[in-house]
Amino acid sequence: MGSAARQPLFSFGVIADVQYADISDGRSFLGVPRYYRNSILVLQRAVETWNQHGNLKFVINMGDIVDGFCPKDQSLAATKKLVHEFEKFNGPVYHMIGNHCLYNLPREELLPLLKIPGRDGNAYYDFSPTPEYRVVVLDGYDISAVGWPQEHPNTIAALKILEEKNPNTDKNSPAGLEDVARRFVKYNGGVGEKQLQWLDSVLQDASNSNQRVIVCGHVPMSPGVASKAALLWNFDEVMNIIHKYDSVKVCLSGHDHKGGYFVDSHGVHHRSLEAALECPPGTYSFGYIDVYDNKLSLVGTDRMQSTDFEN
């Protein structure tokens, strides 16, 4: 019985990689079917289910709201359409940016649409749903070859990393790269120095306030939870900061689509969520997380696997 018999401190909805586009079904580079028009139906079912639950404090969308294959003259309308569907949830919705978001719209347009409270184009932020908890949302495309203007220092830094780490002409290809070096591809990104300092200060503040922390980011932060080609460029730097604090219990991500779960050497739970995009018609992938004082419990629907994160 234990905590399962008690009421959670709070609960929140989760969904990842909706990647809607008004185009025919296709396949990923690995040949996995993608159901571009159906994904909005997955989201609609998710919102209905979350509202029926009646006690979800908020929803987190783990990024990639619209797909990169969305015709560019439809990018703005498609993003607005999906945001409108999310806003049918009876509560706050927190978004983060993924690579597919940035293939469609520049940050200056995207952040206001998604109501991301960043400054100067930055998309990282934190909030406290209850006094006991802090939620941190990272911007995994802070250092990125997409989304910033071409002359922006973050674009230049990203292109330099790709030039140094990836010898392929196609910088989206990990061909010839081995193990975790496969992460140095254009569709991934990194967390910049300013954001690293911010993360450290937020975690220090949470620790001083005896708050537990849930870290969210579109791009996975551990080689144990996702494909080596779907990792944050500087996951090691981010995790070195996170591991300084006992307060961080869970790192949630999307991006890798197939889903994954891993507990690292410091006892931090990593969970990459199954993509809404890859649900055949009539199937679904979304869920909600019950947060207790001593554990978190992901209650998944259909293709999203339920997971207990025991502290």
Swiss-Prot record:
Q: Which cofactor does it need?
A: Mg(2+)
Which InterPro entries does the protein's record reference?
Calcineurin-like_PHP_ApaH, Metallo-depent_PP-like, MPP_ADPRM
Task: Write down the top EC class of this protein.
Answer: hydrolase
Residues annotated for Zn(2+) 1 binding in this entry:
D17, Q19, D64, H257
Catalyzed reaction equations: CDP-choline + H2O = phosphocholine + CMP + 2 H(+); ADP-D-ribose + H2O = D-ribose 5-phosphate + AMP + 2 H(+); CDP-glycerol + H2O = sn-glycerol 3-phosphate + CMP + 2 H(+)
- Keyword set for this entry? Hydrolase, Metal-binding, Zinc
UniProt cross-references to Pfam families, sorted A to Z: Metallophos
- The positions annotated for binding Zn(2+) 2 are D64, N99, H218, H255
Q: Does the keyword Zinc apply?
A: yes
What subunit structure does UniProt give? Monomer.
Describe the task this protein carries out.
Hydrolyzes ADP-ribose, IDP-ribose, CDP-glycerol, CDP-choline and CDP-ethanolamine, but not other non-reducing ADP-sugars or CDP-glucose.
The text of the family note is: Belongs to the ADPRibase-Mn family.
What protein does this entry describe? Manganese-dependent ADP-ribose/CDP-alcohol diphosphatase
